[in-house]
């Protein structure tokens, strides 16, 4: 799991 995956997940939660 890369940091990009974590960022994507956070963006989904904030969306």
UniProtKB/Swiss-Prot annotation:
Q: Which UniProt keywords apply?
A: Cobalt, Glyoxylate bypass, Iron, Lyase, Magnesium, Manganese, Tricarboxylic acid cycle
* Family named by the database record: Belongs to the isocitrate lyase/PEP mutase superfamily. Isocitrate lyase family.
Top EC group: lyase
Q: Superkingdom of this entry's organism?
A: Bacteria
Q: Which cofactor does it need?
A: Mg(2+)
Keyword Lyase belongs to the record: yes
What does the Swiss-Prot or TrEMBL cofactor note state? Divalent metal cations. Mn(2+), Fe(2+) or Co(2+) can be used.
Give one GO biological process term: glyoxylate cycle
Activity regulation text? Inhibited by hydroxymalonate, oxalate and itaconate.
Q: In which pathway does it act?
A: Carbohydrate metabolism; glyoxylate cycle; (S)-malate from isocitrate: step 1/2
Molecular function per GO? isocitrate lyase activity
Record text on subunit structure and interactions: Homotetramer.
Q: What does this protein do?
A: Involved in the metabolic adaptation in response to environmental changes. Catalyzes the reversible formation of succinate and glyoxylate from isocitrate, a key step of the glyoxylate cycle, which operates as an anaplerotic route for replenishing the tricarboxylic acid cycle during growth on fatty acid substrates.
> What protein name does the entry list?
Isocitrate lyase
Q: Which reaction does it catalyse?
A: D-threo-isocitrate = glyoxylate + succinate
pH-related activity note: Optimum pH is 7.5.
EC number of this enzyme: 4.1.3.1
